[in-house]
């Protein structure tokens, strides 16, 4: 499967989002939207409004939950400050 990435710069942070080729439309769309109907803007908002965050050493990623948005986000750091948003999805009550 062919991939591209899109960059969002917000509050001095660079968020990198994977895009996948949609086989039905033959156009690139956000991976997290194709899989979970979450936009990068929603995932970034969840990053800034996180209620809970932990590091998962088995997966080498951070996992956060935003109670106000009811969204879980998986991400990792690239080049110290750049953030690769791996995926995001709705998941209520996980850390309550």
Residue ranges: model-predicted function:
Residues 1-96:
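Ribonuclease/tRNase effector modules and their secretory precursors
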